[in-house]
Amino acid sequence: MKVSVAALSCLMLVTALGSQAQVTNDAETGFMMSKLSLANSEVLDSFHAINADCCTSYIPGSIPCSLLESYLETSSKCPKPGVIFLTKNGRRLCVSPSNKQVLACRIMLKLATRIKTRKN
Protein backbone atom coordinates (compact mmCIF):
# COMPACT_ATOMS: atom_id res chain seq x y z
CA MET A 1 0.00 0.00 0.00
CA LYS A 2 2.81 2.41 0.91
CA VAL A 3 4.58 1.66 -2.38
CA SER A 4 1.48 2.44 -4.44
CA VAL A 5 0.91 5.72 -2.55
CA ALA A 6 4.55 6.69 -3.09
CA ALA A 7 4.36 5.77 -6.78
CA LEU A 8 1.14 7.74 -7.23
CA SER A 9 2.64 10.77 -5.45
CA CYS A 10 5.74 10.57 -7.61
CA LEU A 11 3.63 10.32 -10.78
CA MET A 12 1.57 13.37 -9.79
CA LEU A 13 4.74 15.36 -9.06
CA VAL A 14 6.30 14.45 -12.42
CA THR A 15 3.08 15.38 -14.24
CA ALA A 16 2.87 18.76 -12.51
CA LEU A 17 6.52 19.58 -13.15
CA GLY A 18 6.31 18.44 -16.77
CA SER A 19 3.34 20.68 -17.56
CA GLN A 20 5.04 23.62 -15.80
CA ALA A 21 8.19 23.05 -17.87
CA GLN A 22 6.12 23.13 -21.08
CA VAL A 23 4.46 26.42 -20.08
CA THR A 24 7.86 27.93 -19.28
CA ASN A 25 9.32 26.70 -22.58
CA ASP A 26 6.39 28.15 -24.57
CA ALA A 27 6.74 31.51 -22.80
CA GLU A 28 10.50 31.62 -23.43
CA THR A 29 10.05 30.75 -27.10
CA GLY A 30 7.47 33.52 -27.52
CA PHE A 31 9.73 36.00 -25.75
CA MET A 32 12.74 35.11 -27.90
CA MET A 33 10.71 35.32 -31.11
CA SER A 34 9.41 38.76 -30.10
CA LYS A 35 13.01 39.93 -29.61
CA LEU A 36 14.00 38.97 -33.16
CA SER A 37 14.22 41.98 -35.42
CA LEU A 38 12.00 42.02 -38.48
CA ALA A 39 15.10 43.12 -40.38
CA ASN A 40 16.47 39.65 -39.72
CA SER A 41 13.74 38.00 -41.77
CA GLU A 42 16.07 35.23 -42.93
CA VAL A 43 15.98 33.75 -39.43
CA LEU A 44 12.19 33.88 -39.40
CA ASP A 45 11.98 32.45 -42.92
CA SER A 46 14.26 29.59 -41.90
CA PHE A 47 12.23 28.97 -38.75
CA HIS A 48 8.97 28.76 -40.69
CA ALA A 49 10.47 26.78 -43.56
CA ILE A 50 11.80 24.08 -41.28
CA ASN A 51 8.56 23.81 -39.35
CA ALA A 52 5.94 24.30 -42.04
CA ASP A 53 7.34 23.90 -45.52
CA CYS A 54 9.67 20.91 -45.34
CA CYS A 55 8.82 17.33 -46.21
CA THR A 56 9.81 14.71 -43.67
CA SER A 57 8.37 11.92 -45.80
CA TYR A 58 6.67 11.48 -49.16
CA ILE A 59 3.19 10.12 -49.76
CA PRO A 60 3.23 6.77 -51.54
CA GLY A 61 1.37 6.14 -54.76
CA SER A 62 0.08 8.49 -57.41
CA ILE A 63 -2.01 11.65 -57.13
CA PRO A 64 -4.56 12.66 -59.77
CA CYS A 65 -3.53 16.12 -61.03
CA SER A 66 -7.20 17.11 -61.22
CA LEU A 67 -7.35 17.15 -57.40
CA LEU A 68 -4.53 19.69 -57.09
CA GLU A 69 -4.83 23.46 -56.79
CA SER A 70 -1.23 24.67 -56.46
CA TYR A 71 2.24 23.65 -55.36
CA LEU A 72 5.44 24.95 -53.86
CA GLU A 73 8.97 23.62 -53.82
CA THR A 74 10.53 23.11 -50.43
CA SER A 75 13.39 25.34 -49.35
CA SER A 76 17.00 24.35 -49.94
CA LYS A 77 17.34 24.64 -46.14
CA CYS A 78 15.11 21.60 -45.69
CA PRO A 79 16.85 18.32 -44.91
CA LYS A 80 15.05 16.56 -47.78
CA PRO A 81 14.00 17.95 -51.20
CA GLY A 82 10.30 17.93 -51.91
CA VAL A 83 7.27 19.43 -53.57
CA ILE A 84 4.21 20.31 -51.50
CA PHE A 85 0.94 20.11 -53.41
CA LEU A 86 -2.13 21.91 -52.07
CA THR A 87 -5.29 19.99 -52.93
CA LYS A 88 -8.62 21.60 -53.79
CA ASN A 89 -9.95 20.57 -50.37
CA GLY A 90 -7.01 22.22 -48.55
CA ARG A 91 -4.76 19.25 -47.76
CA ARG A 92 -0.98 19.53 -48.13
CA LEU A 93 0.78 16.56 -49.72
CA CYS A 94 4.56 16.08 -49.76
CA VAL A 95 5.88 14.30 -52.82
CA SER A 96 9.28 13.48 -54.27
CA PRO A 97 10.44 16.03 -56.85
CA SER A 98 12.02 13.25 -58.93
CA ASN A 99 8.67 11.52 -59.52
CA LYS A 100 7.64 11.83 -63.21
CA GLN A 101 3.96 12.29 -62.33
CA VAL A 102 4.90 15.16 -60.00
CA LEU A 103 6.63 16.89 -62.92
CA ALA A 104 3.55 16.41 -65.12
CA CYS A 105 1.24 17.85 -62.43
CA ARG A 106 3.55 20.83 -61.90
CA ILE A 107 3.51 21.61 -65.63
CA MET A 108 -0.29 21.29 -65.72
CA LEU A 109 -0.66 23.66 -62.75
CA LYS A 110 1.72 26.22 -64.32
CA LEU A 111 -0.30 26.19 -67.53
CA ALA A 112 -3.59 26.53 -65.64
CA THR A 113 -2.19 29.50 -63.71
CA ARG A 114 -1.06 31.22 -66.92
CA ILE A 115 -4.48 30.72 -68.50
CA LYS A 116 -6.22 32.21 -65.44
CA THR A 117 -3.82 35.17 -65.42
CA ARG A 118 -4.46 35.95 -69.09
CA LYS A 119 -8.25 35.82 -68.63
CA ASN A 120 -8.08 38.47 -65.90
Curated annotation (Swiss-Prot):
**Gene Ontology CC terms:** extracellular space
Q: Which InterPro entries match?
A: Chemokine_b/g/d (IPR039809), Chemokine_CC_CS (IPR000827), Chemokine_IL8-like_dom (IPR001811), Interleukin_8-like_sf (IPR036048)
Keywords, ordered alphabetically: Chemotaxis, Cytokine, Disulfide bond, Heparin-binding, Inflammatory response, Secreted, Signal
Question: GO molecular function of the protein, one example?
Answer: heparin binding
- Which CDD domains does the annotation name? Chemokine_CC
**Disulphide connectivity of cysteines:** 54-78, 55-94, 65-105
Cellular location(s): Secreted
Domain of life the protein comes from: Eukaryota
Signal peptide start and end residues: 1-21
**Coiled-coil ranges from the UniProt annotation:** none
Q: Which GO terms describe its biological process?
A: antimicrobial humoral immune response mediated by antimicrobial peptide; cell chemotaxis; chemokine-mediated signaling pathway; inflammatory response; positive regulation of cell migration
**Its function?**
Shows chemotactic activity for monocytes, resting T-lymphocytes, and neutrophils, but not for activated lymphocytes. Inhibits proliferation of myeloid progenitor cells in colony formation assays. This protein can bind heparin. Binds CCR1.
Please give the family membership noted in the entry: Belongs to the intercrine beta (chemokine CC) family.
Please identify the protein, giving its name as recorded. C-C motif chemokine 23
Give the organism the record lists: Macaca mulatta (Rhesus macaque)
